[in-house]
Regions:
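Active-site beta-strand/loop architecture of penicillin-binding DD-peptidases
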Residues: 221
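Flexible helix-coil transition and linker loops at the boundaries of alpha-helical arrays
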Residues: 1-3
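An aromatic- and glycine-enriched ligand-binding surface/loop that stacks and positions planar moieties
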Residues: 10, 20-218
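Active-site neighborhood of glycoside hydrolase catalytic domains
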Residues: 16
């Protein structure tokens, strides 16, 4: 639409809701670490007193943003078909998660888009695994971030009895029938049996990676 990428009323309400949520969070709500966080006049910039009312303000602002977005016909993105030019995950959930912020036709869910064109040495090339065409994987999630993804059972990795967190760095062989990695090859234990968001957003050793045309289909790292 003509307003795509602009600071619309929906974008403003959404940003307000997010800021109030930050204000209510333990990071800012009663955090004693900010006791000496003052301006040059000695005035306290962040209160160190906890206030439950901040959560109510955040919730009210979020509901206001949701109602406004609903009236403006925003909706959750769903990728309904696989591209004929480039390979994409066949699983609907994984494909929708992957394409939400990639599909340039996604005008339904994205509220405040970055519309500037990226240059040659953009975040895209810094994020893509190294290949001869000029990508070098200079940006990657930390192990701590990887640990935050849930297991295939929808549980944190330290709460799922079927996931042995002590073996997360062990090298394992990918079993036959695996759809998110190459069967028979090796990867780390922590890459196995994770939730759809993990496979939609994280590239890992011998996991499938859509970096070629459909004529070649998936390749792997």
């Amino acid at each position: 639409t003509a307003d795509y990428g602009r600071a619309t009323s929906v974008a403003a309400k959404s940003l307000k809701a997010r800021m109030l949520l930050y204000a209510a969070s333990p990071l800012f709500n009663g955090n004693p670490d900010y006791a000496n966080f003052k301006n040059p006049d000695g005035e306290q910039l962040l209160s160190t007193t906890y206030s439950e009312e901040k959560y109510k303000r955040a919730a009210d602002a979020a509901w206001e943003a949701i109602e406004l977005a609903d009236a403006a016909h925003y909706k959750l993105y769903e990728s309904t078909s696989v591209s004929t030019s480039y390979p994409e995950p066949n699983d609907l959930t994984q494909r929708s998660l992957r394409m939400t912020f990639i599909d340039k036709e996604d005008y339904g869910e994205v509220i405040f888009a970055e519309t500037r064109k990226a240059g040659t040495y953009s975040i895209q090339r810094k994020s893509i695994p190294y290949f001869p065409r000029g990508s070098w994987n200079g940006i990657a999630p930390t192990i701590t971030m990887i640990d935050r993804f849930y297991t295939a059972n929808g549980l944190p990795i330290d709460e799922d009895p079927e996931f042995n967190i002590n073996n997360k760095l062990d090298i394992v062989t990918i079993p036959d029938g695996t759809t998110y990695a190459v069967p028979g090859r090796q990867t780390l234990y922590m890459h196995m049996n994770r939730e759809p968001r993990f496979y939609a957003w994280v590239a890992f050793e011998n996991g499938y990676y859509e970096c070629r045309t459909t004529a070649v289909s998936y390749t792997h790292l």
